[in-house]
Amino acid sequence: MKLDAKRILVPVNGKPYSERSFRWACQIAREAKTELHAVYVIEVPLALSLESEISDDINKGEEILARIEAIASEEKYKGLQARFLRARQAGPAVVAESENKSMDLLIVGVPYKRQFGECSLGSTASYIFHNVSCQIMLSREQAPSPIPSRE
């Protein structure tokens, strides 16, 4: 399958499934010679202004982006553009970043979780899936063994 995308965006959050998705994106971007962007969203509570100094969250974001840059290096991808954003909610921020930067493809990692007996994407991935205009690939983490019954 030939990848038509020239610009790929991967939202990251520091969780293992997010790192695996990013690693996969690095491999795809390297082979396709595509631009790769990573974004970490700091969700700022409504009680604070978006410009508030939330040093713990900023430090966490910097650590996550440093880890993402290390993964890109391990995967021999050069030219990663990684940054963090401040927003009220991650989903709308990722969609806006995708639109503003004219992304062709989003690769979104999601955890394996079941809610009410059904697999659930979670609110952020669901928002992105329903609102982004470019192509999207979901990378769900592997189910635990054995898979819980649906009873």
What are these regions (language model features)?
Residues Y40, G109-P111, R140-E141:
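Short secondary-structure boundary segments
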Residues V108-N131, S145-P148:
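Glycine-rich, Arg-bearing micro-motifs that act as flexible, cationic patches
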Residues K2-E51, E74-E75, L80, N131:
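Small/aliphatic-rich secondary-structure junction motif
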Residues W24, D57-A70, A93:
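Short, solvent-exposed amphipathic alpha-helices that sit
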Residues C134-P146:
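Short, flexible loop segments at boundaries between secondary-structure elements
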Residues M1-L3, S73-L106, S126, P146-E151:
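Structural beta-alpha unit
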Residues V39-E63, R83, P146-E151:
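Acidic, proline/glycine-rich short linear motifs
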Residues S21, L48-E51, P92-V95, E118-C119, ...:
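Short, well-ordered secondary-structure micro-motifs
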